[in-house]
C-alpha cells in the first residue's frame, strides 16, 4: 500500500487545518484517488467493529441480502439455526458477486455464474462440471479450501457488527 506522501502533496493537507478564513477543503485527490480510499479504509475501518445493519432486516431462516462496505461486497444471511452470518459476497470460483439483491435462500447459496453452491455455513457443496461435462468432482480440487470467506461478526444491542 502506498504512503499518503506518495499520493498527494502533504502541504495541501496543512491548509485544511488553518484558520477558517485561510482554510481550504480537502484536495480533490481525497475524493478521486483509489490509493487514498485504501488508506482511508485502513485507518478508519481496519480492526474496528462496524455496524452493518439490524437483525430484524433478515428475520427469517434463509433471509439474505447483499451489503456494500466501501466497495467490499458482503452477504448478510440468517442460517438454519437462526444465527446471522456474514460472508464476502464473492464466489471462490471466478470472483463473481453471488447476491445481487435481497432474497430468500432455501438450501444453498448459489453463484449465478457457474452455479457453484455453498451451504449456510459457507462450505462449498457443489461444483458443477468441474471435472468436465457432467463430472461434478475432481480429485485434484479440494472443496474444503474454497468455501465462502467469513467475516468476524457479532450481534450488539440489536445491531449487526463486523470486524474487517
Regions found by a protein language model. Give the residues of each.
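N-terminal pre-ligand scaffold of iron-sulfur
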Residues: 1-101, 149, 153
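Short Gly/Pro-enriched turn/cap motifs at secondary-structure boundaries
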Residues: 141-145, 152
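A generic structural signal for well-ordered coil/turn residues at beta-strand boundaries
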Residues: 112, 147-149
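Long, hydrophobic, well-ordered secondary-structure blocks that form the structural core
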Residues: 85-142
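Single conserved hydrophobic/aromatic residue that forms the stacking wall/gate
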Residues: 155-158, 162-164
